Amino acid sequence: MIDIAEGPGRDLKNIRQIGTPAEGDRIYIENAAYARVHEETYEERRVFIFMGHTECEQGVYMTFVEAAIPVRDMEFSQNLPRWGTHAWSDVFREIKRSYENSIIVGWALDCKGYPPRLTAELEAIHREQFGGAHQVLFLMDSMEGEEYFYLHKGNRLQPKNGFYIYYARELHEIRIPDVTIELPRRGTRQMLPEILTESKKAVSYTHLRAHETLANL
């Protein structure tokens, strides 16, 4: 049985294990975010920003990837993304619009037809652009179906042999009492059921938030 700390405002269910996660820090990615980075496309190389939050329980850090933001018009040089002001500006606008209650927890790089292996150049890019101690890197080759998470361990990025996919309840229906509607012309009453649909809002549990990063934009 997988042991997960249930945080307030989060409904995790139907957790699926990918690979063989060893003991230590854990990575959880929401099914919709996982599906998004695997969407079929003609693009040979893609980059995503992971939004979510982190938690710590008894010294074990858990990274929750709740959403994946595609980075549009990313420039590449020898399969390495060239992060610049233009790319980050688009990302920050999307964060400000839709993800102010989350933080950046890492990123993903998909290079079709190339083994998803960490190189010194990629690690340098990660350290420069994603310096957080618990920000993860997800390398993919969607053509061959290979993928690996990397996280900080000591002073290096180390591969994680497995991770977890969880399914968050995004919408649920609440039944409220029938509403009586007066029909003045006929002088009769009609009972109509009304359904209220609520959206579940993600909650971040860290003191760093994306909207604080964007305060000066």
Task: Label every PLM stretch briefly.
Residues T206-T213:
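Conserved small/polar residues in nucleotide/adenosyl-binding loops
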Residues M1-G106, C111-S199, R209:
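N-terminal beta-strand/alpha-helix entry module and adjacent surface
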Residues A202-V203:
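Acidic, proline/serine/threonine- and glycine-rich low-complexity intrinsically disordered segments
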